Structures are given as C-alpha cells and as structure tokens.
Amino acid sequence: MKLRPMQDRIIVKRVEEETKTAGGIYIPETAKEKPQEGEVVAVGNGKRTEDGKILPLDVKVGDKVLFGKYSGTEVKVEGQDYLIMREDDILGVIEK
C-alpha cells in the first residue's frame, strides 16, 4: 500500500462481514451493516505532545480492533477500501 498515516492516525481494513446468518439465511447487500471490526494495516509515528515529544501508539500493524459506527474517513487506495482514523477512535483491541 502506498499510503502512510500521519501522527496518531491509523489505517484500518474492515473485516469481511458474513453474508449468511447462523440459521442459513443469506443477507442481501442492501440490508448489511458495515462491520465495526477491522485489522490495522498501517500506523503513524505517534501523537505529538504540547512540548514536542512524540508518544508512540498503543496499536500496531496486524492488531484486530473494534471502532465506533461512524469512526474514520473512508478512502479507496489501489481498488481497496480502507478507513483512516485517529487512535482515539479505537474502542478496543481483540486479543488472540
């Protein structure tokens, strides 16, 4: 990917949502909600404090994260959809 986030921003790729329910019913595209879970694919250098120091981010590339429904800005790079958001928009990291 040729996109590098700045400062405390991260780039997230949404996970693919299931097209079939547990009961075997297929969900049409128009009825699906966008998932609020994704994988971090790039991180910025960190958040700059008022005194000029850079605080490293808590999330790292490869982390599975949960974020708010309206978090981030959707972008398309090389035909792939991504979200650019601040680390503050992350609600939690899914531990393995």
From Swiss-Prot:
Key words, A-Z: Chaperone, Cytoplasm
Gene Ontology cellular-component annotations: cytoplasm
Subcellular location: Cytoplasm
Membrane-spanning ranges: none
Pfam families the record matches: Cpn10
Location (main, coarse): cytoplasm
Keyword Cytoplasm on entry: yes
InterPro entries, alphabetized: Chaperonin_GroES, Chaperonin_GroES_sf, GroES-like_sf
Record GO terms (molecular function): ATP binding; metal ion binding; protein folding chaperone; protein-folding chaperone binding; unfolded protein binding
BP term (GO), one: chaperone cofactor-dependent protein refolding
Signal peptide boundaries: none
Protein's UniProt keywords contain Signal: no
PANTHER family: 10 KDA HEAT SHOCK PROTEIN, CO-CHAPERONIN GROES
Subunit architecture: Heptamer of 7 subunits arranged in a ring. Interacts with the chaperonin GroEL.
Its biological purpose: Together with the chaperonin GroEL, plays an essential role in assisting protein folding. The GroEL-GroES system forms a nano-cage that allows encapsulation of the non-native substrate proteins and provides a physical environment optimized to promote and accelerate protein folding. GroES binds to the apical surface of the GroEL ring, thereby capping the opening of the GroEL channel.
Family note: Belongs to the GroES chaperonin family.
Protein name: Co-chaperonin GroES
Source organism of the structure: Geotalea daltonii (strain DSM 22248 / JCM 15807 / FRC-32)
